From Swiss-Prot:
Reaction equations catalysed: a 3-demethylubiquinol + S-adenosyl-L-methionine = a ubiquinol + S-adenosyl-L-homocysteine + H(+); a 3-(all-trans-polyprenyl)benzene-1,2-diol + S-adenosyl-L-methionine = a 2-methoxy-6-(all-trans-polyprenyl)phenol + S-adenosyl-L-homocysteine + H(+)
Residues that span the membrane, as ranges: none
Pathway of action: Cofactor biosynthesis; ubiquinone biosynthesis
Paired cysteines (S-S): none
Family the entry assigns: Belongs to the methyltransferase superfamily. UbiG/COQ3 family.
Pfam families recorded: Methyltransf_23
The entry's keywords: Methyltransferase, S-adenosyl-L-methionine, Transferase, Ubiquinone biosynthesis
GO molecular function per UniProt: 2-polyprenyl-6-hydroxyphenol methylase activity; 3-demethylubiquinol 3-O-methyltransferase activity; polyprenyldihydroxybenzoate methyltransferase activity
Identification of the protein by name: Ubiquinone biosynthesis O-methyltransferase
Keyword S-adenosyl-L-methionine annotated: yes
Function: O-methyltransferase that catalyzes the 2 O-methylation steps in the ubiquinone biosynthetic pathway.
Binding site for S-adenosyl-L-methionine: 38, 58, 79, 124
Domain of life: Bacteria
């Protein structure tokens, strides 16, 4: 996410909402609701978080990063938004979560500093907000140790995802602010798989994240038509 791989409008969206990041009744409610699901999925697929060195790319206000630290990981969260990072730092301090740090730095720049330093790299709900997702994937591959795990999540690009993730989530159910997502930045699983292979990662698992607006319940299932998560591995011995 060097300056060439940052969309200032995307940064501004989340800067404006930063103060609400830890309010579970705000626009960030969906992130709080899905966090236990994605946290458990990452923990399980990575063979545990405790004692691992973890990087969270595009960490925002720290919801996932802090929850991984609470499970015993040594976490660095990075983002290009200053206001969300300030919120994340303050929340970790208030909650006395010591094994976590935050930095405002592009992931590509960090990859030049800390190649092969992390057991686990996560990049969740961010890929659809950057101009060049392939560059992010490559940087994550550089940062993880051989034998380490890299996790991504994003939104598929098809008529169903437009209906559900934009019309439904932003306009009908109002789960998210209008304009949160740009359909043209959504990423098909085939495109994601191609970029993963090109970066030198091995695709291990892909699962869909689903929502029932009547029960307000989220769950994981194989269908990846809308939201989905990806587990990859950097082959080799650490």
């Amino acid at each position: 996410m060097s300056q060439l791989n940052v969309d200032p409008q995307e940064i501004a969206k989340f800067e404006a909402l930063a103060a609400k990041w830890w309010d579970q009744h705000s626009e960030f409610r969906p992130l709080h609701q899905i966090n236990p699901l994605r946290l458990n999925w990452i923990d399980e697929h990575a063979g545990g978080l405790a004692g691992k060195k973890v990087l969270d790319v595009g960490c925002g206000g720290g919801i996932l990063a802090e929850s991984m630290a609470r499970r015993g990981a040594d976490v660095l969260g990075i983002d290009m938004g200053e206001a969300p990072l300030n919120v994340a730092r303050l929340h970790a301090e208030q909650e006395q979560v010591a094994n976590i740090e935050y930095r405002q730095i592009p992931v590509e720049e960090l990859a030049q500093e800390q190649a092969g330093q992390y057991d686990i790299v996560t990049c969740m709900e961010m890929m659809e907000h950057v101009p060049d997702p392939a560059s992010i994937i490559k940087a994550c591959q550089t940062l993880v140790k051989p034998g380490g795990h890299v996790f991504f999540s994003t939104i598929n690009r098809n008529p169903k995802s437009y209906l559900f993730a934009i019309i439904g989530a932003e306009y009908v159910l109002r789960l998210l602010p209008k304009g949160t997502h740009d359909y043209h930045k959504f990423i098909r699983p085939s495109e994601m798989a191609h970029d993963i292979r090109e970066a030198g990662l091995k695709l291990k698992d892909m699962t869909g994240l689903h929502y029932n607006p009547l029960t307000k319940h989220y769950w994981l299932a194989p269908n990846v038509d809308v939201n989905y998560m990806v587990h990859t591995l950097k082959e080799g011995q650490s």
